Each structure stands twice: as C-alpha cells, then as structure tokens.
C-alpha cells in the first residue's frame, strides 16, 4: 500500500498544545521587561489621543487577595483594549501608604513606647517593604504599567502636594474647625472616616425610661387640661444606656400625635400610635385621656432621672415610629442628629456635656459612674434607673451596629474638636460643596448606571467631612492657631506653601520637627502649632491633584481629570466619594469623567470569602497551578456589575474554555505552515466564496468586539470570541476547509485562499484576546507568519479584514442558510452513526429533498456542496420526491436521507468515490487526488 502522507499538506506548528502557563508566563514577563514594553508603548503613543485611567491606590499592607486581582485585571483589560483602539493609555499604579493599619502593625512589632519620630520612620520602611511584595504580585498577573515609577502617597512630592491641595480648600473657604460628633474608636484613639466603619451584629440593652415633668402647668395646657391629676413623665426608648448620663434634651416629631396616658400611678406621654405596644411592653393597663401634636410640647421641661438638671423638649423630624416610644432622648455629644437639633435651639459648645474620654472611660468627675468603661457601665446605669423608679422596661436585642474596620470593636459617636470640610458652608465664591458635588454627579457617566443614584444619595445626605486624625503616621494639617482666639493664622495659605516646600525635600517629618519660630518668628509665642494629621481618605482623595497634576502629570485641557476611575462598589463611600469632594472644592468638577464599579468576590454559593469556610481563592495559588491567563479569562467572563462568583470548579471551567480558544489558535497556526503573507496573500476578489465570508464574518465580529471593549462589557467579548472559536470556526468553517487545506496543491489557489483567510482571522483573533489573555496573545504573536514587531500590544485592531460587497452572490444570508442545512445534516449523521449505519461522515451519502428556492441556493455550490457538508456525495432532489423514510428537518422546505456509500474509500482524502482505483498508477486513490498529485490540480470556486 502506497503511503500518500508526503503528498498531503499536513498541519505543522511549534506552538505548543499544552499551555504550561505557570512556567511560561514568568518567561513572557521577563521578555516584556527586557524589551522595555511599557516604555515602547509610551513612545508609540506620543501623538495619539490620551486615555487616562487613574489608579485607586490599594493599601500598602499584606499580600494581595482575589479582590485586588479582579480590580487590577479589569484595569489592565481596559488599558490594553484602549491601546489597541489607538489611544495613548498610560497606567501609573499607586499605593496608599499612611494611616492607622500600618501604624498598628508597627506598634505590634516594635511596641507602643516608640517616639513619634521612630513611629513614622518604621511606618515608612514597613510601607516600602509591603509595596515591593504587592508590586511583584500585581506584575505576575500580567498588568502593564509604570512599575518602576509608581505613585505612593508617602512620596515626598505627594505629601507636599496633599498639603497644597488642602491649602486650596482653605483658600476656597471650605475648611473649618468645629465640635461635632464623629465616628470614634477607643482602640484607635481617633476619629474614623465613614469608609472605615463596618456594621456587625451587636447585643445591646434597650431601656424605656421615664423623665418626670418639671413644667406641670405647661404640660397640662399642651393637652388642653386645666391641671394634671397625678404625677406625669415622658418616656424615651434607647439602645445606648451609657448615653443617659449625657442627656440634655428630649426630641419629639412636630407632626406626630402624642397621648397622655393614665396608667394608674402616673401619667405617661407616648406617641399615640405606639401606646398599645408600649403598655404591653411595660405590663401596664391604661387609658388615653388627651392627645396633642408634638409641636405643642416644644420647650416643656422634664427632669433628668438621676441628675439635678432639666431636659427640654425640642422638635426634630428625624424621630420615627418604627420602634420605641416616639420620643428620642438627646445626648448632643454622642449623636449627630442630637447635636444638630441642640445647636439649632441655641446650645453653645461649652454647654455640651461630654463625659466620655477618648479611651471610652467616663471622666472621674461624673457622678455615680466616673472611671467606668462605658460598655461595662451599662448595667450600673440600668440599675440606677431602676433604683430611682425611672425604668419601665429593659431587654437585650441583637442589632446591626457600627464597628471599627481594623479592631472589629464597637464605635460610638463622640463630639470632639476636629477639622472639617463643610458640605453646606458658603465658600469664598460659588456654590456650596454639596451643590457642586451633586451637579458633578449629574455630569459623570456611571458603569453600571445604578452607581449614580447611590453616590447621589450618599452626597445628598452626608454630614460635614471630618478630615483630622490624632495619629503619628499621616500627612500633617500644618495650621497655627492663635492661643487666645483659636483662629487660624491670617497667612495660613502662604505658610502652608512654605511647609509644602520643606515637606517636598524632607517628607512629613519636616513639619513635626519644625519649630514654630522657624516660620512665624516673633509671632510664634502667640500661636499653637497643631499636631493633627489628615484622614487617609484625604490622601487618596487628592491624588488627582498631586499625582495627575504633579508627580505624574496626565492633565487634560480642563486640568487634572481622569477619563475613568475603576474600583469596587464600596468606593462609592470611599475613594470615589473623597475624590469627588476634593475635586469639586478645588476645581469645581469631578476629577473623573466616568466611574466604573465592580462587585465583590463570593464563592459559588454566594458566600463571602472566609478562611473559616475554607472557600478563599488565593490569586498566588491560581498563578502557580493554572496560570494568570485563566484568572484573567474568569474575570472577563464574569459580569462584574454584581457579585463575582469564583471557586476551584469555576476556575476549572475557565481553564476548559481557555483550552478551546488555545486549540483554535493552534489549528490556525498549524494550517499557516508554509504561508508567507508577503508572497502568498491573495486579494479578496481572488479568494473562494467561503473564505471571503469567513473574513467578512471576522470583520463584523471585530466591530462588535470593539464596541463591547469600549463599553467595558468584557463578558460579551469573552462569550463572542469563545462562540466564534467553537461554533463558526470549529463547528463550521475550519471543518470544511480541512479537505482543501490538506489535499489540494501546496501552492494552489484553493489552499492559498483558505490560508489567506486563516491569516486574517489569526491577525484579528490575536488582538481580540490580547486584553484578556495577555500572556497567550503574545505567545501566539511570536508564531504568526510574516514580519512583525515585538508584541501584539504595539499594534492596533487589525485593519486587513475586508467586507463582502452588498451584491455578492453568496453573501451573509446565503451562508447562514447553508449553515442551517449543515446543522440539519450533522444531526442526522449523528443519528446514523449512533445506529452504526455509517462510520465517519465521509462514509455517508446524503440526498437533500428541497423546495425550489432552497434547492436553487444549494445548487449554486454545484459539486462543492459535498465539501461543505463533509460527506462523500451530496445530491439534490425535489422536495415532492422525498420518500417516506426521508427525515424532516427544522429547515423549512428540507427533508434529507443519509445512506452508507457503496463506493471504496480513497486512501488519501478518505472520501468514498466511484473513481477510486480507476488510475492504474494509483489504484488506492480517487481521481481528484490523482489530479492534485500529478495533474493540474482540482479547481475550487466556492468551498
């Protein structure tokens, strides 16, 4: 038997079938570094339009987790796709370096007896060490960026820039000193930002407390009575017994109705709607003897249960009827609403009672409870209330309560003297900060769109921003306060610039080491140099000023404004929020044109990642077992607008999908063996109809993909590329052209036409996958034929694809119809194979019984129809002649019948043909193969 293998154009490529990503990816990273890929991208991008994605800085503490990986991969996919779309898209990674978590780590390692200078020195060293570790982990994910020159909020230039940003806000009239309740952590010994607050379940004692009336005549008059027949009290309900010693007022809603209830021994004032539930709770019987609106109770005095002072009634619309009594006890030092209401009624700061010290212990001067920690004092307060006959009810409930994100301990609101950015304070010029920010939100694009309403609600309802902290490791608030008046120095903005210049040279240490006389001279004795530091959200929230404008200038025509900020959905109250406020205060616009938020990672059951649950997916492990490209493919395939499910099984499915894409790429490369685009590329008009369709289909898909990349819909990119590889290529086109590729002459038009199409498809595909499969795309790039530069990323979307003319006879709709027929034939072939009626498809002969229109269309392929259907013969017959055993199909006007061919099998092309053995020199092969080996070669027109 003659071996005809040498006469075939068998596929051949060195591109490995097995990816070996964990081993191969580090080699590719090394190559990117050696060729200076990021620098080359900046060079070719010089004259391109700029696209700036400003990096929200991760905190420089600990190894990266899967959430970090998602965030950086999404950013990288955008940077890469924008680069391929013809933009200059730099990416400068950043790190958030100051703040309590690092200070806490240093204290744990080195003890708490460090000097402030030692603390700052050790914090700086610790942050630097953490950055290097995280940097290596981010690079391993394939993230392109200026890793040699990242921005760090602790860089001297950025510390100085932050002081200058604060100076701009002082100059604009947004900054003020005030006494206000802020989130306070006893363990931190400092105020916390809203974004540093977590909510966890906490058990608390609820108490219903009676405050005896002091103005009996006024209370009687409010209820339309001449006098009160017996003792009366108003009842409050609270979950914070520890605040009762600081009670200074009682709040009722002006529009709610309140009832005077006779319970036998005394009269109780309760919200009318809650009388029944309250009496049941107190195990009392009673009757309503009069009602009055809350507004009638205004300024009536009641007595504190155990201190000799009065508590007046103030009207407040935040009072609710959801629980309690409809009366709220007001401790202005420990509640924001309480504080605002008491101030509205004229209470001055010096009159606000604030017995809780920074460590959570009552001042020793507090009667009954001095020196006690507030949480431990709760039972003693309940006992005292019971002792004086004021306690009507107590029980323990579990409720959601604010906790410190670092220490996981309960927080309180506590009034302290702090520096604030005023939301509604009238600035030196223009609208208030709240007005500016709300307008800026309207001018910003949001992905997903619901982010706009979320951020709008937060800004509309947020209090003034407390920007001061009482810590060592932070950018200083370089203010001098007059010792007598407490006012800022009149030259504050000018002095801040002098401080910034020193910080630029020496870092924040310059301020803390500085003597006031160095700047103030003889005036120094009149001023206090403050030691407060800035909230870390002010650090990252001003990077648009000191990074985009300063150390890494990427400004647009309107100043430092990024095209995109991209972070997790928690950043609506974090970085997006603080950046918006500083941007609007300084530049009167948001520092971003568009905001993109992604959800959090959960396991396949929707549970949060937790070591105790054993469901943590570590990106480092994924890199070492599957490869970063698998993780990148999973990110691309997941709709990031909601929770992002990940598990070993989910990643394995991504690995399976990766193999299908890789195998498609390998098939393309292996069939481009011997193809030189410089000499073998055919013009579109010389290509076979099917090949022209394949290139046209690729062009249409590329247009869709460019749109999806532009709208950051990576899951659509993934699904369309995957389907293209599996269905249109693997399930249709590539199957059909195998015969032509392998059996026709090596340099025949039929083969070169297919190779031209494969080349165009490969050039497009390698670019499509480059933003997602960053490593694999560059590996594939090296194996493509023809002269090319060092990386796929140094190019733009492929421009060599051609569109089918509108009048092309075998156009898009035509091939869609053919595909439907092929699906129907394949379905029946599968049935026949399962029944052992035929072996492979090429053992089959198919007869298509078609209506006239369909028959005419299929007839256009002439004798090449069999190559499209991949059967040894394909015959057409009128639909009316279909025998009873013909199979109906889902294609209208088509029935078909498959039988096993009676003809011998060609040893070369494996088709069963009547003319096998006709040629005496080649008794084992068909006439077509003889012609392809020793004759002029077959001529194909369509497929």
Swiss-Prot record:
Zn(2+) binds at residues 906, 909, 926, 929. One of its GO terms (biological process) is isoleucyl-tRNA aminoacylation. Its main location: cytoplasm. PROSITE patterns: AA_TRNA_LIGASE_I. L-isoleucyl-5'-AMP binds at residue 567. GO terms for cellular component: cytosol. A motif ('HIGH' region) lies at residues 58-68. The keyword Lipoprotein does not apply. Keywords: Aminoacyl-tRNA synthetase, ATP-binding, Cytoplasm, Ligase, Metal-binding, Nucleotide-binding, Protein biosynthesis, Zinc. Signal peptide: none annotated. HAMAP family: Ile_tRNA_synth_type1 (MF_02002). Belongs to the class-I aminoacyl-tRNA synthetase family. IleS type 1 subfamily. Monomer. IleRS has two distinct active sites: one for aminoacylation and one for editing. The misactivated valine is translocated from the active site to the editing site, which sterically excludes the correctly activated isoleucine. The single editing site contains two valyl binding pockets, one specific for each substrate (Val-AMP or Val-tRNA(Ile)). This is Isoleucine--tRNA ligase. The lineage of its organism: Bacteria, Pseudomonadati, Pseudomonadota, Gammaproteobacteria, Pseudomonadales.
